[in-house]
Amino acid sequence: MTKKAILMIAAALAAVSGAAWAQRDPAYAAARAAGEVGEQPDGYLGVVGGGNAQLRALVSNINIQRKAAYTQKAQASGATVEQLAFTSGCNLIAQTKPGEKYRTPDGSWETRGAGAPVRDSRCV
């Protein structure tokens, strides 16, 4: 599987996945808008700070759905789950809007400003 093919699959997955989860669960949209959750370079959603049990359960559920989607796409494409998850993470961070949280490559949480987010140098 070529890197270009992996990127195309992951981009499609990220675009559908992020939008679908945000529309399905108002609690997710509210937590994202409040800066309580954010996108991570590994393709999974993270809790900013400790969060409460309900928020951690929400994030865990979304991440289970993401892993299932990454696994399905990986099996169909010949890529690894980790490759698809990482590429999706790159795309999901790029798709954040100003005011939303994301994790930088050094592990710190940042709030997206008007400019481009800081992403892993391997992101295309």
State each model region's role.
Residues 81-82:
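An anionic, turn-rich surface loop/hairpin at beta-sheet edges
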Residues 33, 63-78, 89, 93-97:
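Sec-exported extracytoplasmic/periplasmic mature domains
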Residues 23-39, 44-50, 54-57, 85-124:
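Amphipathic, charged alpha-helical segments and their helix-to-coil junctions
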